[in-house]
Amino acid sequence: MGKGTPSMGKHGRSKTHIVCRRCGRRSYNVAKGYCAACGFGRSRRMRRYSWQNKKWNRVRVV
């Protein structure tokens, strides 16, 4: 099969994100190699901003 419209339906088969081994959330992008939630794989420091309200290791950090 080529690269047209029929092949676009095959994109949803594989998982884009898997469980991150640092934060435990299903946010680790396999193709890009980093976690969208904590920044693992891109930075040694935890991805954190003042405007967000997230959980680290399933514990709420404000």
From Swiss-Prot:
Annotated keywords: Metal-binding, Ribonucleoprotein, Ribosomal protein, RNA-binding, rRNA-binding, Zinc, Zinc-finger
One Pfam family per UniProt: Ribosomal_L37e
Keyword Amino-acid biosynthesis among UniProt keywords: no
Zinc fingers classed as C4-type: ranges: 20-38
Keyword check for Glycoprotein: no
List of residues binding Zn(2+): C20, C23, C35, C38
Cofactor(s) listed in the protein's UniProt record: Zn(2+)
Cofactor note (record): Binds 1 zinc ion per subunit.
A GO biological-process term: translation
Sample GO molecular function, one term: rRNA binding
GO CC terms: cytosolic large ribosomal subunit
Membrane-traversing stretches: none
Cited NCBIfam families: PRK04179.1
Family under the similarity heading: Belongs to the eukaryotic ribosomal protein eL37 family.
Primary role: Binds to the 23S rRNA.
Name of the protein: Large ribosomal subunit protein eL37
Protein species of origin: Aeropyrum pernix (strain ATCC 700893 / DSM 11879 / JCM 9820 / NBRC 100138 / K1)
Gene name per UniProt: rpl37e
